[in-house]
């Protein structure tokens, strides 16, 4: 048996063990254990299906090779072997991709944060446009989007939007969106038809629990104040808005979308934990960068990753030199897979 076949056999064995464990009374009565084992089984389900098929093809190849000695069946066996060898090769390619080490955060939900950068009102308008594209993409993927916090500007755009996106494989696909997105287009208010360039930043932060990020309460500075509306007018007569600052890192989160101070504090704390976890990921990636090829998806907010040129209907993905002349269609349909799939393929190729 080859090394690959042995590896796949052990994966199948573990999958069968998990199936048995998940139907045992002991595990069913332990929610934590049940969730843990279910996640493990789910993580190897795809590779298990491919493994079963691959091992079956190997068995068929072995049988047909034996039939080559039979004069009556040798020609039929030769034809069958051609088909089987092609199938074996295709399965090996797919299995190698499935065996690439998984990012431990790939199955997590995310906090998506979009912030207007240079370019004034135009940047704020593009925050709204790109957020709509992400929402359409989420619809295509059957993900759930919940706006956690938003700050509008005076022309119908946004200074900032933070949303929680839940669903299968959210982080695995959207992690490549982190960075600076540049937009080039003629603003509606531009009478001379001049193209303006503006930029926004996108952050992708995995949703984390208390076990993954533990915060010492003494490291937090919590301030409460009255929520303000547009132009600074007061929209709440009580001190319901909350600002939490993590003193060791000086990372700060403000929240005023809810009328309840308790709810604002809870939301702010969750986002703070996500930002601290994002910082951990960035530091780990920097430490690992010296030991491996540079990978797409560093998550650095300052890295200019993409340009959206509306006059040319062009989307340029700078990290992999990808150019698509279907910008408007992608933005309106939300079919970001046209950009994300090549990014994933490039990231996977770094392991080969």
Swiss-Prot record:
PTM comment: Methylated by PrmC. Methylation increases the termination efficiency of RF1.
Broad class of where this protein is predominantly found: cytoplasm
Any matching Pfam family: RF-1
N5-methylglutamine modification, residue list: 233
UniProt keyword annotation of Cytoplasm present: yes
Location of the region described as Disordered in the Swiss-Prot/TrEMBL record: 288-309
Gene Ontology CC terms: cytoplasm
GO MF terms, alphabetically ordered: translation release factor activity, codon specific
Biased composition (Basic and acidic residues): 289-306
Keyword line: Cytoplasm, Methylation, Protein biosynthesis
Subcellular locations according to the entry: Cytoplasm
Function: Peptide chain release factor 1 directs the termination of translation in response to the peptide chain termination codons UAG and UAA.
Family as reported in the entry's similarity comment: Belongs to the prokaryotic/mitochondrial release factor family.
UniProt xrefs under PANTHER family: LD18447P (PTHR43804:SF7)
The protein's name: Peptide chain release factor 1
Organism: Helicobacter pylori (strain G27)
